[in-house]
Amino acid sequence: MDQSNYSSLHGFILLGFSNHPKMEMILSGVVAIFYLITLVGNTAIILASLLDSQLHTPMYFFLRNLSFLDLCFTTSIIPQMLVNLWGPDKTISYVGCIIQLYVYMWLGSVECLLLAVMSYDRFTAICKPLHYFVVMNPHLCLKMIIMIWSISLANSVVLCTLTLNLPTCGNNILDHFLCELPALVKIACVDTTTVEMSVFALGIIIVLTPLILILISYGYIAKAVLRTKSKASQRKAMNTCGSHLTVVSMFYGTIIYMYLQPGNRASKDQGKFLTLFYTVITPSLNPLIYTLRNKDMKDALKKLMRFHHKSTKIKRNCKS
């Protein structure tokens, strides 16, 4: 049998944390809890911002998109991850691995670009408040979202296709708990310099360029906030922007460390825990970060809870 086709016939073995079975049991519980928090928190943000007409603004339009993205991102990874952590079966089919890799890279790229667009939205709202709704009109917001998803899809197709075309010479064991690009590059039996440099180059475009734009936007925002005499306005701007900067720091920090190192020098276990952080923990914290100091979102969530309570009460009365 041609060894280069072995993986396509038999799939991949995901080692995960199989060297630490007790850790796997603990991690499976932790991951399941964070996944539940992600599902509940992000779904609540989407519903609350849709039901409250006061939140039908560009800022919350992008926040809904981020919440939807986090739901998709985690769902593309965590169910399979839990199967890997819980049971003895550590395999994933070749087709399953391909789908996971393409979707994972696509959605990860979308988040990088979406965070940059959200910073531009805050820049426009704070630095050009009189022109905010003219500049950030619904048509432009929709075009931005379509462009983000399209560019990210192209990035995913290029990187994943390059990686999957690398021959593995029969090696189908991935020292990871998901089909991640660095793990697949490591099992190749040929020189991977071209692929690694492609990842690095596209990483600069998809990761570093948006990050630079975010930092520039917040430089102007900080300047505008310091000029504002109203303490209440300063506090509101700092709360909103502080939430976004926290999310940016958590997400970009791990992504840069993982993908923008030529040769990917992160150790095996270090790489796994970093992946756990930005695929499991960060999406679950986003709803908390964005609502903790946001009075409008808190009020919208209270309305959603009252609406749910009333609808439940009506259903009970109808049944009785």
Swiss-Prot record:
GO-annotated cellular components: plasma membrane
Main location per the UniProt record: membrane
Ranges per topology, Cytoplasmic: 50-57, 121-139, 220-236, 293-320
GO-annotated biological processes: detection of chemical stimulus involved in sensory perception of smell
Recorded consequence of changing M81V: In allele 6M1-15*03
GO molecular function: G protein-coupled receptor activity; olfactory receptor activity
Membrane topology: Multi-pass membrane protein
Disulfide pattern: C97-C189
Family: Belongs to the G-protein coupled receptor 1 family.
Listed name of the protein: Olfactory receptor 2W1
Organism (species): Homo sapiens (Human)
Name of encoding gene: OR2W1
